Design a protein with these regions (language model features):
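N-terminal helix-loop segment corresponding to the beta1-alpha1 unit
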Residues: 1-96
Length: 96
C-alpha cells in the first residue's frame, strides 16, 4: 500500500541520514526528487557492483528522481527554490 502516494518530497542530500530517510518515504509511495550537484552524489562512485553503478547509491536512492543543478548558479537556485515551495516535505543534510 502506498500511504504517501500524493506526497512530494524534495531532498538535497548526501551521505547516509537524508538518503535513508527519503528512500523510506519513496518506499511508502512518495514522489522523491533528489537534488544533486553537477558531478553527482559522491556515493555514485563508491563501486560499480550493480550494473556499473554503486551498490550503496542504488540501495539508498531507489525509487527517486534526480535533478542535477549547480546551486551556485542563480537560475538553478531559482528552480530548486520553486520546487521546494511546491513540496510537502523538504529534507537536507548539508553543512549549516
Amino acid at each position: 500500500m502506498n500511504f504517501l502516494e500524493n506526497i512530494l518530497v524534495v531532498s538535497i542530500e548526501q551521505a547516509v541520514a537524508a538518503p535513508l530517510c527519503s528512500s523510506r518515504l519513496a518506499d511508502a509511495g512518495a514522489r522523491v526528487i533528489k537534488v544533486e550537484r553537477e558531478e553527482g552524489d559522491f556515493a555514485r562512485y563508491y563501486d560499480k557492483d550493480v550494473k556499473g553503478e554503486s551498490a550503496y547509491f542504488v540501495w539508498l536512492n531507489r525509487g527517486k528522481e534526480s535533478l542535477v543543478v549547480n546551486l551556485k548558479d542563480k537560475n538553478d537556485r531559482s528552480i530548486v527554490k520553486n520546487i521546494i515551495q511546491s513540496a510537502d516535505v523538504y529534507i537536507q543534510n548539508l553543512i549549516p
